[in-house]
UniProtKB/Swiss-Prot annotation:
<dbReference type="GO" id="GO:0009349">
    <property type="term" value="C:riboflavin synthase complex"/>
</dbReference>
<dbReference type="GO" id="GO:0005829">
    <property type="term" value="C:cytosol"/>
</dbReference>
<feature type="binding site">
    <location>
        <position position="127"/>
    </location>
    <ligand>
        <name>(2S)-2-hydroxy-3-oxobutyl phosphate</name>
    </ligand>
</feature>
<dbReference type="InterPro" id="IPR034964">
    <property type="entry name" value="LS"/>
</dbReference>
<feature type="binding site">
    <location>
        <begin position="85"/>
        <end position="86"/>
    </location>
    <ligand>
        <name>(2S)-2-hydroxy-3-oxobutyl phosphate</name>
    </ligand>
</feature>
<protein>
    <recommendedName>
        <fullName>6,7-dimethyl-8-ribityllumazine synthase</fullName>
        <ecNumber>2.5.1.78</ecNumber>
    </recommendedName>
</protein>
<feature type="binding site">
    <location>
        <begin position="56"/>
        <end position="58"/>
    </location>
    <ligand>
        <name>5-amino-6-(D-ribitylamino)uracil</name>
    </ligand>
</feature>
<dbReference type="GO" id="GO:0009231">
    <property type="term" value="P:riboflavin biosynthetic process"/>
</dbReference>
<comment type="pathway">
    <text>Cofactor biosynthesis; riboflavin biosynthesis; riboflavin from 2-hydroxy-3-oxobutyl phosphate and 5-amino-6-(D-ribitylamino)uracil: step 1/2.</text>
</comment>
<comment type="similarity">
    <text>Belongs to the DMRL synthase family.</text>
</comment>
<feature type="binding site">
    <location>
        <begin position="80"/>
        <end position="82"/>
    </location>
    <ligand>
        <name>5-amino-6-(D-ribitylamino)uracil</name>
    </ligand>
</feature>
<dbReference type="InterPro" id="IPR036467">
    <property type="entry name" value="LS/RS_sf"/>
</dbReference>
<feature type="binding site">
    <location>
        <position position="113"/>
    </location>
    <ligand>
        <name>5-amino-6-(D-ribitylamino)uracil</name>
    </ligand>
</feature>
<keyword id="KW-0808">Transferase</keyword>
<feature type="active site" description="Proton donor">
    <location>
        <position position="88"/>
    </location>
</feature>
<dbReference type="InterPro" id="IPR002180">
    <property type="entry name" value="LS/RS"/>
</dbReference>
<dbReference type="Pfam" id="PF00885">
    <property type="entry name" value="DMRL_synthase"/>
</dbReference>
């Protein structure tokens, strides 16, 4: 039996990050966590490229362009969609998650979903570096592991 597992070793890997500017006070914390994780696991700062987009809905397009470029071992998608008083949240959260999943399958590049979808601002704050850890950090670790698995297979 051969077991394939990715390692959290980022040396010689290159990552693209696309992040929504809307709810930037949350997204910025996710970005800090992601960059921290990449550097702590050996990714050179010059091998991290960050693209800011207006909001979460725009993330999949830039993630797709990054994936198609074949310059990156993985793409990390960050942002925050917080439920408000209208149904806008439902549409944005659904389309962003579907878009990111489709890119991963179509382009065969790890495209990691690090977009918070929360019921309220408190939940978003908790997941951006307080009680529930930093989901940006976790997304970056997932990207490193997946990039290493892809390189093994």
């Amino acid at each position: 039996m051969n077991i394939i597992e990715g390692k959290l070793i980022g040396q010689s890997l290159k990552f693209g990050i696309t992040i929504g500017r809307f709810n930037e006070f949350i997204g910025g914390k996710l970005l800090d966590g992601a960059v921290d994780a990449l550097i702590r696991h050996g990714v050179d700062e010059k091998d991290i490229e960050i693209a800011w987009v207006p909001g979460a809905f725009e993330i999949p397009l830039i993630a797709k362009k990054m994936a198609k470029s074949k310059k990156y071992d993985g793409i990390i998608c960050l942002g925050a969609v917080i439920r408000g008083a209208t149904t806008h949240y439902d549409y944005v959260a659904s389309e962003v998650s579907k878009g990111i999943a489709k890119i991963t399958l179509d382009e065969e590049v790890p495209v990691i979903f690090g977009v918070l979808t929360t019921e309220n601002i408190e939940q978003a704050i908790e997941r951006a570096g307080t009680k529930a850890g930093n989901k940006g950090y976790e997304a970056a670790c997932t990207a490193i592991e997946m990039a290493n698995i892809i390189n093994i297979i």
